[in-house]
């Protein structure tokens, strides 16, 4: 089966890590970063079985600074 590289964007919420695949829109979570990515991989593969993507473009990821008041 052919494979494709996707992006995982992670952030921590309390005691869980949330992982999102921006190319597909799938989201999953885990107690560790590794578990969150493994769960995201599984969710993405299951999603793509039902809804194949015609083509996937890599997202542009940028970091920016913003003023925070409070």
Name what the model sees in each region.
Residues 1-5, 9, 35-70:
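Short, charged, surface-exposed hinge/linker loops at domain edges
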């Amino acid at each position: 089966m052919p494979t494709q590289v996707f992006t995982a964007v992670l952030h921590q919420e309390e005691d869980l890590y949330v992982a999102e695949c921006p190319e597909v829109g799938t989201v999953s979570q885990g107690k560790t970063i590794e578990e969150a990515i493994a769960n995201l991989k599984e969710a993405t593969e299951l999603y793509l079985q039902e809804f194949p993507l015609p083509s996937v473009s890599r997202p542009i990821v940028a970091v920016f600074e913003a003023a925070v008041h409070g």
